[in-house]
């Protein structure tokens, strides 16, 4: 029934879309007044002061994938909104389904890697059951974390997967590994679509060029991210390995959720400057270094409240090389090339789906920055990635078109690959021409 209803929406534009995901870090007003928006948090300069803002989105990688559907699809600007289905159900109760179906044409949910044993889908599931057969629901970005049995999942999460499989008009998953796991467990209605965050800024992806980073070699400015967090009084081994790999590299590090493991620093005033989204690197390099067996090497430590600042900061760098997928996507969205350090199936699945360059941190440290840039940002690699990206985009929008969702930008052409260097005779002709005008 919902599939037929969604299909009829193709001729009804603009759609009123409800986005279930925190694409921005803003408080949700509890007042029942029209034409109001949530306020941002008050400026702070400490980790403890940042915590209420952090809880608006959780891990900051969430804002990259959660804002993407709102960026991609044409919609009614005044009739569309972000929100939390479970919280709205709790507030308005029995009238929930009626009011939602009257107010919106479709619900879009950005889920990320929720197929794991520690995720409980009970609250979201309750709200979706209330909406069943009332409003079409699209789910994007679903991913598997680890490789667990279905019986390892919390009952509410297993039931949420079942609901998506049976009722969502699109059950979009990140890649083949997730789709195969679902199929093996009896869930056979998933579409492999990748992460929506890659489709938000297609001109940036198609304009990627690794030549500047390759030319700078060891002098390239690098943005990175990973797991430099405290566990049992020491930095996690994965974070230590990353820091060591960057010892002789000019790099900035982006936090996503790590500062809340720095309990000893939580109340320190002046540690963070919200104006430039930076923590004090001099203090953190020393403090973290004491827990890592040596001073950390990073020039800057970033923490972002919204995605635009993240993208803008990426432009200060020549390349992203890091152990967080959405940290790399933020760079790609800004037109900065990215190389992903891959250590689990979350990153591997997405980099393979889009043909994004990836290797392990150990391999990166062994090869060295100049060699990695030459190998992974070569014109051939970039061209192949763009060709596959265009194919993935076409697949994504063919599926979303089935339910009436239309992208504002689509069907970009793959730019022709420029030669690595002009042929020698051409350079000689240019020199002769230049001498004529001296």
Predicted regions and their residues:
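Active-site anion-handling motifs in enzyme catalytic cores
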Residues: 2-438
């Amino acid at each position: 029934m919902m599939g037929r209803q969604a299909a009829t929406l193709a001729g009804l534009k603009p759609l009123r879309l409800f986005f279930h995901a925190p694409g921005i870090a803003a408080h949700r007003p509890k007042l029942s007044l029209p034409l109001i928006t949530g306020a941002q948090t008050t400026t702070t300069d400490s980790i403890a002061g940042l915590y209420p803002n952090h809880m608006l989105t959780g891990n900051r990688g969430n804002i990259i994938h959660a804002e993407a559907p709102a960026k991609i699809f044409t919609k009614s600007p005044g009739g569309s909104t972000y929100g939390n289905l479970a919280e709205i159900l709790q507030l308005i109760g029995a009238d929930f389904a009626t009011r939602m179906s009257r107010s919106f044409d479709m619900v879009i949910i950005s889920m990320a890697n929720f197929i794991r044993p520690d995720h409980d889908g009970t609250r979201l599931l309750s709200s979706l059951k209330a909406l069943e057969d009332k409003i079409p629901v699209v789910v994007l970005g679903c991913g598997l974390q680890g490789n667990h049995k279905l019986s390892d999942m919390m009952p509410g999460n297993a039931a949420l997967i079942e609901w998506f499989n049976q009722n969502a008009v699109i059950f979009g998953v990140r890649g083949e590994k997730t789709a195969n796991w679902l199929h093996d467990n009896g869930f056979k209605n998933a579409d492999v679509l990748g992460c929506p965050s890659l489709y938000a800024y297609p001109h940036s992806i198609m304009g990627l060029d690794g030549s500047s980073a390759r030319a700078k070699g060891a002098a390239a400015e690098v943005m990175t991210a990973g797991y430099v967090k405290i566990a049992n009084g020491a930095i996690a081994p994965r974070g230590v390995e990353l820091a060591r790999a960057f010892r002789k590299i000019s790099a900035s590090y982006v936090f996503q959720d790590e500062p809340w493991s720095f309990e000893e620093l939580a109340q320190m005033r002046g540690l963070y400057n919200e104006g430039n989204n930076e923590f004090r690197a001099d203090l953190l390099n020393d403090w973290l270094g004491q827990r890592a067996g040596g001073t950390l090497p990073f020039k800057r430590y970033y923490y972002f409240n919204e995605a635009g600042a993240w993208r803008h900061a990426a432009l200060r760098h020549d390349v992203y090389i890091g152990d967080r997928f959405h940290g790399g996507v933020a760079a790609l969205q800004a037109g900065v090339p990215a190389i992903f350090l891959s250590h689990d199936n979350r990153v591997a699945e997405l980099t393979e789906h889009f043909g994004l360059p990836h290797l392990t941190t150990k391999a990166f440290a062994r090869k060295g920055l100049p060699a990695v840039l030459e190998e992974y940002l070569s014109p051939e690699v970039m061209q192949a990635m763009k060709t596959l990206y265009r194919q993935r985009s076409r697949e994504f929008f063919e599926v979303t078109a089935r339910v009436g969702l239309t992208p504002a930008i689509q069907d970009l052409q793959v730019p022709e690959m420029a030669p690595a260097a002009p042929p020698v005779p051409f350079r000689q002709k240019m020199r002769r021409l230049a001498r004529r005008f001296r």
